[in-house]
Amino acid sequence: MNNFRATILFWAAAAWAKSGKPSGEMDEVGVQKCKNALKLPVLEVLPGGGWDNLRNVDMGRVMELTYSNCRTTEDGQYIIPDEIFTIPQKQSNLEMNSEILESWANYQSSTSYSINTELSLFSKVNGKFSTEFQRMKTLQVKDQAITTRVQVRNLVYTVKINPTLELSSGFRKELLDISDRLENNQTRMATYLAELLVLNYGTHVTTSVDAGAALIQEDHLRASFLQDSQSSRSAVTASAGLAFQNTVNFKFEENYTSQNVLTKSYLSNRTNSRVQSIGGVPFYPGITLQAWQQGITNHLVAIDRSGLPLHFFINPNMLPDLPGPLVKKVSKTVETAVKRYYTFNTYPGCTDLNSPNFNFQANTDDGSCEGKMTNFSFGGVYQECTQLSGNRDVLLCQKLEQKNPLTGDFSCPSGYSPVHLLSQIHEEGYNHLECHRKCTLLVFCKTVCEDVFQVAKAEFRAFWCVASSQVPENSGLLFGGLFSSKSINPMTNAQSCPAGYFPLRLFENLKVCVSQDYELGSRFAVPFGGFFSCTVGNPLVDPAISRDLGAPSLKKCPGGFSQHPALISDGCQVSYCVKSGLFTGGSLPPARLPPFTRPPLMSQAATNTVIVTNSENARSWIKDSQTHQWRLGEPIELRRAMNVIHGDGGGLSGGAAAGVTVGVTTILAVVITLAIYGTRKFKKKAYQAIEERQSLVPGTAATGDTTYQEQGQSPA
């Protein structure tokens, strides 16, 4: 019997250990098992992962990969997951090409061309924040150069995912967290979690990967070389090819070391050169093409990628345990988060290097290259605030209010009109002691105190003042840049204002630098072209609109001005306009990463959704009260659930329940009263019985009294 119990316990422990292992550990076990059995390497170039299409960076694993069947590529060279299939290249696919890239706007990635060229609303900024692109753009602009690129590419496999692939456990868990927030109407928290999902898994999922290796040389030449050269573009690309062949030893029979006049001129005009080995053995000077190609076998990498947007994989087939309508809401929430990521990293401006309005940081052209600047008067900013909740010790508006220095009040000076830029809610958590009396049976009372966390809220409204009529010269404020807790002032390269300027508070943490000293402050003054936000446009774009503030205005800058991001305030971007050519120096900005939405300080109360009905296919889902899992409901269960929801079942309504509670309390009070009364009456009867018993023996009582009296009189 003991042996039987021991066996049962052993198998239970083994089953628990097996079920308790994370999926990642199970994959490691499967990989090692296959490597031991087949004595083959594992193919590491795999699709099914997340991809950031702005930065060209691999992200977290979206699709689950397992190695239970120990599958191999068709040529038997590598172990591959069960959910992957490969298309081997039966013949050696060695490609060599040379190209001229005259502008960074036409740049194409060497390793993610296919996924970057997808057609979408934001495809123009795909790859614009990759290290490869930013290096090339910086060199082209700073050196006034063009780029030539020569590359040798060797494609070995095309690796694709199986359409029946399942989501990874980590990605699936994050989707379930978002769905849980959505079903409980916690939209703000769901938005925040969706933005975290984009941060961890990117914007796309790779569905196909080209595995191989590439050897690339990029040369940057003075732009004047191509313009002044009497030869054709083909001659320049040929010179680039010769330079590459001198770097990599091709060992051709024909001697390419002899340089003609054009090749020598090419080399003399080269301002920068880089050779990059992607896959294969590491590059070193003098390496032969044959040696590099032979080292590819065990050093495969991705040399191109294809994929689909992240939300495409959030569908009922991938999440069969959730109701269809809820899955669609999750997919839409994630899609919106991806669009917001693209929007906040789109920098409109003039992209023509030859234009005086050129904006180095712009990655999309907005047609502002031809505009001429107009001087505008800046009437200042101010911010109103109204406290909505909180006690007297938590005064939020003291650090949110800002008066206009030109008026000393929350207003604009004469000749200026206010532009309501944005209204938002500011939240701060605070703790306070909350005490109340707690009584039992209305008799036993005590004071109970507890430390309670609550949220104080205040609404702030930001305004800036635009000239609505002719105003006297030097009547407004000088603008000296701005900064926040996460950005610096381009005028000072620090979180500060120039000399002679003072900061005005706007939003929660933006500081706008202004000056009223036209004599000393003009040295650092910057021509200002207005503000605009995600909700309100810039009335200075059209002078006629600035006179009629009731008319809608465009969310852009007037001619001759370039836009720059001021800050992202709780998911809303606020931009400002300055004279083109200013604030565009230095290095290119990195990608602004999510989340952009603040999470709520306190979780909203759950509505405890228990049933979801899909009107399209008349299917209803019920949430199990024990397991909290969704499942398709049976007709009987649906009727029972609806009865509970609408109060038609056997349960009591709120009023009935209250009546029963009052009745039970009354009966209990009566019983307690009767018990107290009965106890007192019983004690009274017992006392009378003793008196009657004492009266039957009077001598005893008299003797006692006499003795007491005698004892009291004897001393006298």
Swiss-Prot record:
Keywords of this protein's UniProt record, alphabetized?
A: Adaptive immunity, Cytoplasmic vesicle, Disease variant, Disulfide bond, Glycoprotein, Immunity, Innate immunity, Membrane, Secreted, Signal, Transmembrane, Transmembrane beta strand, Transmembrane helix, Ubl conjugation
The GO terms this record gives for MF are: wide pore channel activity
Ranges annotated as spanning the membrane: 113-120, 127-132, 235-244, 248-256, 656-676
PTM info: Proteolytically processed in two steps to generate the Macrophage-expressed gene 1 protein, processed form: cleaved by trypsin in proximity of the helical transmembrane domain releases the ectodomain into the lysosomal lumen to orient the pore-forming domain toward the endogenous membranes, and processed by the asparagine endopeptidase (LGMN). Monoubiquitinated in response to bacterial infection; ubiquitination is required for vesicular localization and antibacterial activity and can be blocked by bacterial cell cycle inhibiting factor (cif).
Residue stretches making up the MACPF domain: 30-345
Q: Per the entry, what induces it?
A: By wounding; increased levels are observed in hematopoietic cells 48 hours after wounding. Following wounding, repressed by infection with S.aureus. Isoform 1: By lipopolysaccharide and TNF. Isoform 2: By lipopolysaccharide and TNF.
* Tissue specificity: Expressed constitutively in a variety of cell types including macrophages, natural killer cells, neutrophils, keratinocytes and monocytes. In skin, expressed in both hematopoietic and non-hematopoietic cells with expression detected in a variety of cell types including keratinocytes, fibroblasts and endothelial cells.
Any one annotated GO CC term = phagolysosome membrane
- Specify whether Calcium is a keyword of the entry: no
What InterPro entries would the database entry show? Answer: MACPF (IPR020864), MPEG1 (IPR039707)
Note the superkingdom of the native organism. Eukaryota
Tell me the leader sequence span.
1-17
Keyword Transport carried by entry: no
The glycosylation sites are 185, 269, 375
**Disulfide feature:** 34-70, 350-369, 385-397, 435-449, 439-445, 534-572, 557-577
User: What CDD domains does UniProt report for this protein, alphabetically?
Assistant: MPEG1_P2
Residues of the site described as Cleavage: 352-353, 357-360, 631-632
Any inhibitors or activators noted? Answer: Forms arc- and ring-shaped pre-pores on top of the membrane at neutral to slightly acidic pH conditions and converts to pores upon acidification. Undergoes transition from the pre-pore to the pore in a processive clockwise hand-over-hand process. In the pore state, 2 alpha-helical regions refold into transmembrane hairpins (TMH1 and TMH2) in each protomer that form in the ensemble complex giant beta-barrel transmembrane pores.
| One biological process term in Gene Ontology | antigen processing and presentation of exogenous peptide antigen
Domain comment from the record reads as follows: The MACPF domain includes the central machinery of pore formation: acidification causes a significant structural rearrangement, leading to oligomerization and deployment of the transmembrane beta-strands (named TMH1 and TMH2) that enter the membrane as amphipathic beta-hairpins. The P2 region contains beta-hairpins to interact with target membranes.
Biological role: Pore-forming protein involved in both innate and adaptive immunity. Plays a central role in antigen cross-presentation in dendritic cells by forming a pore in antigen-containing compartments, thereby promoting delivery of antigens for cross-presentation. Also involved in innate immune response following bacterial infection; shows antibacterial activity against a wide spectrum of Gram-positive, Gram-negative and acid-fast bacteria.
Disease the record associates with this protein: Immunodeficiency 77: An autosomal dominant disorder characterized by recurrent, persistent bacterial and fungal infections with multiple unusual organisms. Skin and pulmonary infections are the most common. Patient macrophages show impaired killing of intracellular bacteria and organisms, including non-tubercular mycobacteria, Pseudomonas, Candida, and Aspergillus.
Protein name (database record) = Macrophage-expressed gene 1 protein
Organism the protein comes from? Homo sapiens (Human)
Q: Gene name?
A: MPEG1
